Amino acid sequence: MPLFPALKGRGNKQSLAKAETNEMRKADAPSVGRYEILDEYNIIPQTVSVEISWNPNTMEAMYVVNEPVMSSEELDLLKRITKNMEQIVKNTKNFPDDLSTVTIDKVIDAYLKGRKYKLNRRTTDKIRYYVKRNYEGFGPLEPVVRDPLVEDVSCNGVGVPVFVEHKIHGSLKTNIVFDSEKELDSYVVRLAQMCGKEVSMNEPIIDGTFPQGHRIQLTYGNEIATKGSAFTFRLFRETPFTPIELIKYGTATSELVAYLWLMVENLKSAIIAGVPGVGKTSTINAVLMFLPSNTKVFSIEETREINILHQNWVATSTRESIYSSASRDEKNPPIGMFELVKMAMRQRPTYIVLGEIRGRESYSLFQAISTGHTAYSTIHADSMETLVNRLESNPLNIPRVLISGLNVVIFNKFVRVGSRNLRKLMEVDEIVGTDTDSGEILYNKVFSYDFSQNRQKFSGYSKILNEIRDTKQMTQEEFDSEFQRRIELLEHLVTNNITDYTNITRIINIYYKDPETALKMASGK
């Protein structure tokens, strides 16, 4: 729970974030009579909810945050509490000298008790919500940050609606707007401070990471961004996207997910490719849920995004130098992806996971694959041809002989279905070698998206599945039965809405030892 000292100096800088105009915000939200509600769910039960509404006039969907509406009396009380937070602590004898144990709830209780307020529970809950939202949370964006289905949040300037990237509904405009330069500048300064950094006109561009793991890039003032201060942050989720959610949301079929399961279990290396924002990180987190518990994993990232429930896992991230290039202390050098990949190879992990392929460390990763390591990573590419060109070009410079050691490439793409852009695993390709005459990379399309059926279809041939069958010395009938059993387990998990990653990981690891018991658990028997 956040501690009271962390609140120092924030109260006056962060406005009530339009709590006083909540009625106006609510009025801006679509009404059921004029708009179609596509989706609705709670963020905080009985306090904050979200609606995804379709506007037939503008032909666009909107992300609507519904927060508690404050009466004038409640608003007045809220202002008094937020204005006097630190004074409340100083005037309360029951608080210990060590303020590290003092929480916001205790401060609010002390204020209400000292003034003999008798509030109903609903009013008290509202007060607690707004004080916490503005002091230890993300202010007006707190509901959005809490939403497990939101991946990215961006504000493009004053008077412009905040946009979110939703896992199911794609890019959506919200009903959250910063109305003045002063309000937005103050909010951006606070975001920078939450990352432990300072932003100013002298240093108007900041990249940072919040304590929760969320990654932000922001600009201050209007010298860089003409509409005023702006920011974009990528949300890190403590609860990772699961393979069951890939199936549940129509991103992949159970047949395709069963293929990925066998791929991971049998040490086949893969890259997840696609344009920015298409869900590559969600896919790699889902795929890594199939890692057997008796294996060692080493992950390498610039910013933490990989999240797996695995005990034998070394999770590393790069370190920036705290000095400028002109005054860098050689005793505190930056530690980059290249150094971490070399370190990973020395530790002999079963799996190496590289957050993204984009620099000289990629050559070392492909060398690791060629020497027998299993590796997973992501890359910006939308086709096999684009992928090969990127890998061969500067700054990667990976020769085709190393590229051919990769086993599988999974392409994430956006597909237009009705009015929505949905994420799909569009294509799964297996690299089978290089052409002896032309030197071209040869690959086989194992799964491809069928637009008429809105699903991925198996081509009927997989080199990898055949290799796994032969390695395990199974007949085709035995292998088909095993493949079907995994599909059955996955579909049971979907049917029974078992999407919690801890339960899924547990059932998968039980399957490796006792398939029938795992099937019973998945089916609820």
Question: What is each PLM-predicted segment?
Answer:
Residues 1-195, 199:
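N-terminal accessory targeting/assembly segments
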Residues 259-262, 266-276, 288-415:
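Switch/coupling sub-region of P-loop NTPases
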Residues 280:
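Conserved lysine of the Walker
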Residues 408-494:
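Conserved P-loop NTPase
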